[in-house]
UniProtKB/Swiss-Prot annotation:
<comment type="function">
    <text>Cotranslationally removes the N-terminal methionine from nascent proteins. The N-terminal methionine is often cleaved when the second residue in the primary sequence is small and uncharged (Met-Ala-, Cys, Gly, Pro, Ser, Thr, or Val).</text>
</comment>
<feature type="binding site">
    <location>
        <position position="316"/>
    </location>
    <ligand>
        <name>a divalent metal cation 2</name>
    </ligand>
</feature>
<keyword id="KW-0645">Protease</keyword>
<keyword id="KW-0479">Metal-binding</keyword>
<feature type="region of interest" description="Disordered">
    <location>
        <begin position="1"/>
        <end position="96"/>
    </location>
</feature>
<keyword id="KW-0031">Aminopeptidase</keyword>
<dbReference type="GO" id="GO:0046872">
    <property type="term" value="F:metal ion binding"/>
</dbReference>
<feature type="binding site">
    <location>
        <position position="444"/>
    </location>
    <ligand>
        <name>a divalent metal cation 1</name>
    </ligand>
</feature>
<dbReference type="GO" id="GO:0070006">
    <property type="term" value="F:metalloaminopeptidase activity"/>
</dbReference>
<feature type="compositionally biased region" description="Acidic residues">
    <location>
        <begin position="41"/>
        <end position="53"/>
    </location>
</feature>
<dbReference type="InterPro" id="IPR050247">
    <property type="entry name" value="Met_Aminopeptidase_Type2"/>
</dbReference>
<feature type="compositionally biased region" description="Basic and acidic residues">
    <location>
        <begin position="1"/>
        <end position="12"/>
    </location>
</feature>
<dbReference type="GO" id="GO:0005737">
    <property type="term" value="C:cytoplasm"/>
</dbReference>
<feature type="binding site">
    <location>
        <position position="444"/>
    </location>
    <ligand>
        <name>a divalent metal cation 2</name>
    </ligand>
</feature>
<dbReference type="GO" id="GO:0006508">
    <property type="term" value="P:proteolysis"/>
</dbReference>
<dbReference type="GO" id="GO:0004239">
    <property type="term" value="F:initiator methionyl aminopeptidase activity"/>
</dbReference>
<feature type="binding site">
    <location>
        <position position="349"/>
    </location>
    <ligand>
        <name>a divalent metal cation 2</name>
    </ligand>
</feature>
Length: 463
């Protein structure tokens, strides 16, 4: 594209006929005739001053009288030399090739704006994909072996427990039998430092009676509770091998009045297991569970009471050394976009109640769990620091109870525990109850979503 010729620029004699005409009408004069002298430096105007401008200057200088008798200095009208651009700098207007300015083709960066980390739409790999990759990578050569070992321990222990869970037994005795059995069968007593993290109990043994839905365990120094004929008892305990947790629960009742309640909950759990699978929508599974559960009724004292699915509890996925993951499987129809994925491990459990179907926290302590995202730098009490060290070395992110601490020989831990709880370093879990006079039942299994099949790892011939 042609560019406009700058003003005052004279073309060469071979470039234009106009330039030739000017040369004829105004023939060039010698330097002495024109009165033009060279610069003190001896340099001529390299740009070539216009002849007309030189002549005009000469005439003006002659016309003006010299009053002081001295030769007046002629004003220098020469144009300033164009400065050549320094190396690495651009001209104005820009005409220097960038390759001459930026060595090695290293050009300036633009504005760097980091992606918002919690916006999956702006990330190449979404949080869901990262979670899936983490789960799949977790399925190493020992994955199935560890899970099957933990499941077999659970089956053998609960088979014995079902023979002794009869009216008249205390909850403390029943819990001790379960915990002793798990420690014996895994080969890890959990007394030496770090031994409980290799294999053993995955969380406090749950022994919940009647309207107590979940999270109750006998604690040292509390009033003894005895199992009665008209009680509905939920037995929920977990076994882990190298952090692979098997979570399974069942309900026992001796009065046939509650048979329909147990049947409803067992059927609902089996429905959840049937619908579970890779890419299964969790909202669909929840809807199917609720439909089956709430199709049952229980007759108590001549009154037909519909079985209600608990709305404040849910099934959940299981992570290594973490009983509760990020996914939940409610027992009622819910709006969620979550799906089950290959490599997921789920605890499919259901709770059915003759009460309101909602739970609330009750006074008491079920267990404790370390909050790994909270810093402990602000701890001042030596007892709290010592207890925190014990928790990290022996339980990590596993939930534990007072009974587990005392089994290891830990004493005088109450003050330190209060300090850890008040600083949010340790979470405290309370029992969950429905309305008084109601009855709640529970059944639960752990299922592995393997690439080519699902394996209900805790299934036995009992339930």
């Amino acid at each position: 594209m042609g560019s406009k010729t700058p003003d005052g620029h004279r073309q060469g004699p071979n470039e234009s006929s106009t330039g030739g005409t000017i040369a004829v009408l105004n023939p060039p004069k010698s330097a002495s005739a024109s009165g033009l002298v060279q610069d003190a430096s001896g340099e001529d105007d390299e740009d070539g001053d216009d002849d007309e401008e030189k002549a005009g200057t000469d005439l003006n200088s002659r016309a003006q009288p010299n009053n002081d008798g001295k030769k007046r200095k002629r004003k220098n009208n020469k144009k300033k030399k164009k400065k050549r651009p320094l190396s690495g700098q651009q001209t104005t207007p820009p005409r220097v090739a960038l390759s001459s300015i930026f060595s090695g083709q290293r050009y300036p960066e633009g504005e760097i704006v980091k992606y918002v980390t919690n916006d999956d739409n702006l990330q190449r790999t979404t949080a869901e994909e990262l979670r899936h990759l983490s789960v799949v990578n977790n399925m190493d050569d020992t994955f199935l072996s560890d899970y099957r070992q933990a499941a077999e321990v659970h089956r053998q222990v609960r088979r014995y427990v079902q023979t002794i869970a009869k009216p008249g037994i205390s909850m403390s005795e029943l819990a001790q039998e379960i915990e002793d059995g798990v420690r014996a069968l895994t080969g890890h007593q959990g007394i030496e430092t770090g031994d409980a993290l290799k294999a053993g109990l995955a969380f406090p043994t749950g022994l919940c009676l009647n309207n107590v839905a979940a999270h109750w365990t006998p604690n040292p120094g509390t009033k003894e509770v005895i199992l009665g004929h008209d009680d509905v008892l939920k037995i929920d305990f977990g076994v882990h091998v190298h952090g692979r947790i098997v979570d399974s629960a069942f309900t026992v009742a001796f009065n046939p009045v509650y048979d329909n309640l147990l049947t409803a909950v067992r059927a609902a759990t089996n429905t959840g297991l049937k619908e579970a699978g890779i890419d299964a929508r969790i909202d669909h599974i929840s809807g199917e569970i609720q439909e089956v559960m709430e199709s049952y009724e229980v007759e108590i004292n001549g009154n037909l009471i519909p079985v209600k699915a608990l709305r404040s509890l849910s099934g959940h996925n299981i992570l290594r050394y973490k009983i509760h993951g990020e996914k939940q499987v409610p027992f009622v129809k819910s709006k969620t976009t979550q799906r089950m994925e290959e490599g997921d491990v789920f605890a499919i459990e259901t709770f059915g109640s003759t009460g309101k179907g909602y739970t609330r926290d009750e006074a008491g302590v079920y267990g404790y769990g370390l909050n790994e995202h909270v810093s402990a730098t602000g701890l001042r009490h030596a007892s709290a620091k010592s207890l925190l060290k014990t928790i990290r070395e022996n339980f990590g992110t596993l939930v534990f109870s007072r009974r587990y601490l005392e089994h290891m020989g830990v004493k005088n831990y109450h003050l330190g525990m209060r300090s850890l709880i008040s600083n949010d370093i340790v979470e405290c879990y309370a029992p969950l109850v429905d309305v008084p006079g109601s009855y709640v039942a529970q059944f639960e299994h752990t299922v592995l979503l393997r690439p080519n099949c699902k394996e209900v790892i805790s299934r036995g011939d009992d339930y």
